[in-house]
Amino acid sequence: MKKIMMIALMTAMTLAASAQEKKHIELPAWLNNVKFSGYGMVQYQALDKENAHENSFQLRLVRLALEGRIQQDWYWKLQLQLNGNTSSLNASPRIVDAFAEWQKYEFFKVKAGQYKRPFTFENPMHPITQGFMSYSQPVSKLAGFSDRTGEQSSNGRDIGVQIQGDFLKDNSGRNWLHYQVGVFNGEGINQKDKDNKKDIIGGMWVMPMKGLRIGAFGWTGTRYMATTETTEQGPVSKTESVRKNRYALSAEYALNDWTARAEYIHSQGFAANKDKGDKADGWYALAIAPVIKNKMHVKARYDCYRDQKTWASSKTYYEVGADYLLSKNLQVNLEYARVNERATHSSYNLVDVELDFRF
């Protein structure tokens, strides 16, 4: 009996000591700063285009993210896109963001990894904050969403390294000037550089008053891709490095729940189909006004893209809509668009309804 009591006592003491040790186990400090978040965008669209009627529910985006800081000076983020299929890289679940940024100095920050290209005001915006049923056509076609070069859908992202910063503070502590410039593979997300030639993308904007910024952006580079061209002997296909030279002019005013933004983007360089020529451009202008501040908004957007920089190749959306925030992280959006496609001599109506949530 004494032996049994002794064994039981020793076992209890061992368990108590083990529990005490566990209480003193400390996680690395950077783990305490890790934030888990995500969002989803459920979309319904219907259009009455002649001989191509559509109406469908879809998951526009579903994403999960981890982000945090290491030693205060370093910020990092990993973001996954979950919606899609497993049949192709373009549409399968995939990594969209994976980067770290050294942020010790406000006027000089260094970012490396996979992230949004520093081109235009709209491209880096969160898709819910951006305000409409999709990014504008010129941003989609000329910043790497459904790019005219045939680049895989990359949501405006690439792999590379960039520097950026803000400086020239006024008396209130607000910076007057922002700059950013980076070097990238030029192939979009999750891709190596296929021609060993890098893209250089940069931008700068001034902020002369609170809420207002006016900027300009430039982009030069190449993409190694398959092209087709119609010749006297018939269609010719080959793989080659195709030049991309692009610029954007941008202006935005965002203050007290009001937003007005306009951008013009120009591109020189052949599309995947060379018959479309080597020039394209597009522009958009939008306004978002509060009906109930931080609760309900009405909005309008004029969105035009010319695939060959001619009016005959233009596609234009005339959009109006509204959104209502059911809570801070849940909102409903309704939009109507009249669409004019000059290339196909067609005009039609489009209705979009979305439920967006964050956590």
Where are these regions (language model features)?
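Outer-membrane beta-barrel pore domains
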Residues: 48-52, 71, 88, 99-103, ...
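Active-site-proximal beta-alpha loop/turn segments in soluble metabolic enzymes
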Residues: 182-191, 226-233
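Outer membrane beta-barrel
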Residues: 23-186, 194-200, 205-214, 286-290, ...
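Short, electropositive, low-hydrophobicity segments enriched in small/polar residues
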Residues: 42, 117, 190, 219, ...
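Basic/polar N-terminal segments that are highly enriched at the extreme N-terminus
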Residues: 5, 18-27
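Sec-dependent signal peptide recognition
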Residues: 2-8
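Alpha-helical transmembrane segments and their juxtamembrane interfaces
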Residues: 12-13, 82, 121, 273
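Hydrophobic h-region of N-terminal signal peptides that target proteins for export
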Residues: 10-18
